[in-house]
């Protein structure tokens, strides 16, 4: 990266007269931030954000440069870059599809902001079938390009092995917010950067899914690629 962005605690001000604390979750609707944020050069802003895909809307003067600013701050480590190359998909040679199930199929998070566990196997099979049909529609629209599917559900990824699409290895899948290890963290970054290097990315949405996930949106901004939604 071009900038040493890591700050020490001694670099930060905590005097209220010099700082302003900003929680992006206070700004949920599209226009609720308007008129409430006036940036001042003599203030230090401490921004706490989980839904980072909304940041360009809240700070519009940086929105058009999000991609450039990201790459000034971050670049893949040598180890991550090696893992990305080992995936075997040249950049812009595939279409990415992302599906975030959270607890809908495996129910592997005991605590989650998305309580979407499905009760019956029949309901789970129905959701899987609808997502598969959504992927086939995407494939039909992009016949001459590989479709690379990403998901937090090993069960779903195993269910599409018979389809004319591709996946990465399904080991080390997890959510880093709820317990993690080095391999799981690496898998998360592999998925993020592989999506960012696609020609474009589709996010599959459904009432049962964690459809407001910002993962694919963030990857699309990193790669400055088109982001589309497929409802199932």
Model region roles, listed by residue range:
Residues 105-123, 176-185, 208-213:
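Short, flexible/disordered intra-domain loops and linkers
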Residues 1-125:
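Secretory-pathway glycan-assembly enzymes, especially type II membrane glycosyltransferases
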Residues 1, 146-154, 205-206, 230-232:
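Acidic carboxylate-rich catalytic motifs and surrounding loops in phosphoryl-/glycosyl-chemistry enzymes
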Residues 9-20, 155-165, 216-221:
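Short, aromatic/basic amphipathic alpha-helical patches
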Residues 98-105, 111, 128-181:
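Catalytic donor nucleotide-activated moiety binding site of glycosyltransferases and closely related
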């Amino acid at each position: 990266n071009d900038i040493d962005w890591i700050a020490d605690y001694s670099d930060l001000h905590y005097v209220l007269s010099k700082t302003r604390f900003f929680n992006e979750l206070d700004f949920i609707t599209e226009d609720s931030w308007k008129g409430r944020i006036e940036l001042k050069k003599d203030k230090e802003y401490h921004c706490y954000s989980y839904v980072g895909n909304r940041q360009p809307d809240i700070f519009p003067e940086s929105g058009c440069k999000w991609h450039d600013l990201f790459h000034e701050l971050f670049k893949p480590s040598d180890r991550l870059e090696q893992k990305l190359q080992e995936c075997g998909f040249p950049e812009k040679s595939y279409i990415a599809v992302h599906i975030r199930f959270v607890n809908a199929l495996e129910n592997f998070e005991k605590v989650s902001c998305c309580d979407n566990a499905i009760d019956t196997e029949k309901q789970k099979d129905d959701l899987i079938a609808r997502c598969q049909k959504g992927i086939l529609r995407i494939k039909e629209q992009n016949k001459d390009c590989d479709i690379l599917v990403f998901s937090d559900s090993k069960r779903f990824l195993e269910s599409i092995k018979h389809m004319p699409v591709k996946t990465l290895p399904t080991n080390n899948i997890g959510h880093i917010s709820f317990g993690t290890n080095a391999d799981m963290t690496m898998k998360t970054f592999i998925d993020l950067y592989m999506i960012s290097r696609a020609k474009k990315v589709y996010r599959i949405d459904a009432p049962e899914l964690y459809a407001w996930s910002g993962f694919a949106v963030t990857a699309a901004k990193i790669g400055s690629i088109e982001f589309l939604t497929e409802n199932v």
